[in-house]
């Protein structure tokens, strides 16, 4: 590896960390503003009804999910719909960290609630446009620019690794 290649690889890693931090900030704000839709079925319903209001689509799966044929078909359809409607798409490689960010801290565990609680489907997460302008949010602007740059390099669904805390 030459010095130029090493420097380029190091810059790419730093850029991915920055994009991961921006995604974390966008999810935090969207959660507090209640502009998140969680679940493959719920996402499909929203995309069918109001695709113009969706600014970001996250697809999350681990290695076990990669063998789930039905889920992969859903992902393919969602990706195609998002590309057709100019919706930015990111693939999250660590769904466990995504679950930590999206699940409410005050939610009780199944043992505490006295029954079996169903874990929400976090394979697909949509962030919708809040009433205020999306361009006022620098983190969302950074994600949109990253998605656009990735498309220019023929990477239509870039993979992001959310930073562990």
UniProtKB/Swiss-Prot annotation:
Which InterPro entries does the protein's record reference? GADD45 (IPR024824), Ribosomal_eL30-like_sf (IPR029064), Ribosomal_eL8/eL30/eS12/Gad45 (IPR004038)
**Key words, A-Z:** Cell cycle, DNA damage, Growth arrest, Nucleus, Phosphoprotein
Q: Where in the cell is it found?
A: Nucleus
Q: What induces it?
A: By various types of DNA damage and growth arrest.
Listed GO cellular component terms?
cytoplasm; nucleus
GO MF annotations, alphabetized: kinase binding; promoter-specific chromatin binding; protein heterodimerization activity; protein homodimerization activity
BP GO terms, sorted: cellular response to ionizing radiation; cellular response to mechanical stimulus; centrosome cycle; DNA damage response; G2/M transition of mitotic cell cycle; negative regulation of angiogenesis; negative regulation of blood vessel endothelial cell migration; negative regulation of transcription by RNA polymerase II
User: Taxonomically, which superkingdom?
Assistant: Eukaryota
Looking up SUPFAM superfamilies in the UniProt record yields: L30e-like
Coarsely, its chief localization is nucleus
Q: Which residues carry this modification: Phosphothreonine?
A: 2
Protein's UniProt keywords contain Cell cycle: yes
Protein family: Belongs to the GADD45 family.
Described by its record, this protein's role is as follows: Might affect PCNA interaction with some CDK (cell division protein kinase) complexes; stimulates DNA excision repair in vitro and inhibits entry of cells into S phase. In T-cells, functions as a regulator of p38 MAPKs by inhibiting p88 phosphorylation and activity.
Q: How does it assemble?
A: Interacts with AURKA, PCNA, GADD45GIP1 and MAPK14.
Protein name (record)? Growth arrest and DNA damage-inducible protein GADD45 alpha
């Amino acid at each position: 590896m030459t010095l130029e290649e090493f420097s380029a690889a190091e810059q790419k890693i730093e850029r991915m960390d920055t994009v991961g931090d921006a995604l974390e900030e966008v999810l935090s704000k969207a959660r507090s503003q209640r502009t998140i839709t969680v679940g493959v079925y719920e996402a499909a319903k929203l995309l069918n009804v109001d695709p113009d209001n969706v600014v970001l689509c996250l697809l999350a799966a681990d290695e076990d999910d990669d063998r789930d044929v039905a889920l992969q078909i859903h992902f393919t359809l969602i990706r195609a719909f998002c590309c057709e409607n100019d919706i930015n798409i990111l693939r999250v490689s660590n769904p466990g960290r995504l679950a930590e960010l999206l699940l409410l801290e005050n939610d009780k565990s199944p043992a505490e609630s006295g029954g079996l609680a169903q874990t929400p489907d976090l394979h697909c997460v949509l962030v919708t446009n809040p009433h205020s302008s999306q361009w006022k949010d620098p983190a969302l602007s950074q994600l949109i620019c990253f998605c656009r740059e990735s498309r220019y390099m023929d990477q239509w669904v870039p993979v992001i690794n959310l930073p562990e805390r």
